[in-house]
Amino acid sequence: KSSAADTPRMDREGFTAAPIAAAGKLLVGQSKGDAGTRGWIAALDIETGEEVWRQYTVPAPGEFGNETWADDHGAWKTGGGSLWTTGSYDAEQRLTIWGTAQPVPMFDPEFRPGDNLFTNSAMAWDIDTGALKYYFQYTPNESWDYDENGVHMLIDAPFNGVDRKT
């Protein structure tokens, strides 16, 4: 008997979203979370191809958000959170914003109790450092395969009489 965790990681990763070229970097998102791996985004140097930073959408122990994977068997290791669709880039704020998919296994929320951050979320990362700037989780402990796969439209909109970036 084997599990997704026993299969080499590279055999379980893939890409469906087009990359974003911005600020001298190529932003790519891993999108094969249904195969039992954690989603991630990476920035590659356009000239050298070297990885500048990588951030996972499902946090490991000790990282912010891992406490929302409230199990005793390491469900975060195969947690999902893929980036199915190309994100957005805000050049002025130097942010890239992407939507993440459901947690895995998707139809077994009891295997992965808790909110399962940062699955089914909008996530914004600093393009230079990869630091998470903000997030919003649409459906905690999502088990219906909703995903957050829409492209985030970035606009200036009035709020209480003041234009705000939204």
Model-derived features with residue positions:
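Repeat-blade elements of multi-bladed beta-propeller folds
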Residues: 11-35, 75-105, 109-111, 121, ...
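Extracytoplasmic/lumenal domain signature
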Residues: 1-10, 40-77, 110-148, 153-163
